[in-house]
């Protein structure tokens, strides 16, 4: 396994819809394993393929994130290929949502409390499950990445423009 570069806003790959995975082959499996290692090293609770420069509909996530079962020593992750949210309910505000591709910034984002997610596992088996709480937030956040949507696209225009101004200023200072 290898650590991958995490692309940061405003990288073009983050701003466009990722391509469906047609075949789960050794290249996809290697990418998933590298993404899992990169996610834990960052550290994060989820990572989408566009965040590592790959326009593919793949996410990895820590299923224990926010759980009382979470063990810092266990680097277990799960992968979803071509995931989609097929139902949602409830409404919560995720507190201090952050993103590895949007450094040094966190904010509240309105997210659904429960989502039903459908996708494939690495063996190509169809999965469908309900995610609640933090896992629901992770699913919405990572699947947004696959659609070219960053969490800063889901906040007020004022806050988003302030962040973009900060990024532009940082880019011109280098």
From Swiss-Prot:
Q: Which residues form a coiled coil?
A: none
Q: Which SUPFAM superfamilies match?
A: Peptide deformylase
Question: Which GO biological process categories is it annotated with?
Answer: co-translational protein modification; translation
UniProt keyword Ubl conjugation present? no
The protein's annotated catalytic reaction(s) are: N-terminal N-formyl-L-methionyl-[peptide] + H2O = N-terminal L-methionyl-[peptide] + formate
Which co-factors does it depend on?
Answer: Fe(2+)
Show the InterPro entries listed in the entry.
Peptide_deformylase, Peptide_deformylase_sf
Question: Keywords of this protein's UniProt record, alphabetized?
Answer: Hydrolase, Iron, Metal-binding, Protein biosynthesis
Paste the cofactor note: Binds 1 Fe(2+) ion.
Binding residue positions for Fe cation: 99, 141, 145
Q: Where, by residue number, is the active site? A: 142
Mind listing the GO molecular function terms for this protein? metal ion binding; peptide deformylase activity
**Is Isomerase one of the keywords?**
no
EC number(s) reported in the record: 3.5.1.88
Q: What does this protein do?
A: Removes the formyl group from the N-terminal Met of newly synthesized proteins. Requires at least a dipeptide for an efficient rate of reaction. N-terminal L-methionine is a prerequisite for activity but the enzyme has broad specificity at other positions.
Query: Which family would the database say this protein is a member of?
Result: Belongs to the polypeptide deformylase family.
Can you name this protein?
Answer: Peptide deformylase
Q: Which gene encodes it?
A: def
């Amino acid at each position: 396994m290898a650590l991958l570069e995490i692309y940061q806003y405003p990288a073009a790959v983050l701003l466009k819809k990722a391509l469906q995975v047609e075949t789960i082959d050794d290249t996809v499996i290697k990418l998933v394993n590298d993404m899992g290692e990169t996610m834990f090293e960052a550290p994060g609770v989820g990572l989408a393929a566009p965040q590592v420069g790959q326009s593919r509909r793949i996410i990895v996530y820590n299923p224990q994130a926010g759980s009382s079962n979470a063990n810092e020593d266990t680097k277990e992750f799960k992968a979803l290929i071509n995931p989609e949210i097929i139902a949602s309910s409830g409404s919560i505000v995720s507190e201090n949502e952050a993103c590895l591709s949007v450094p040094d910034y966190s904010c509240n984002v309105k997210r659904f409390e429960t989502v039903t997610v459908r996708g494939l596992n690495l063996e190509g088996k169809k999965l469908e499950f309900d995610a609640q709480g933090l896992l629901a937030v992770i699913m919405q956040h990572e699947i947004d990445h696959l659609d070219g949507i960053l969490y800063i696209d889901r906040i007020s225009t004022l806050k988003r423009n302030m962040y973009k101004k900060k990024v532009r200023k940082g880019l011109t200072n280098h």
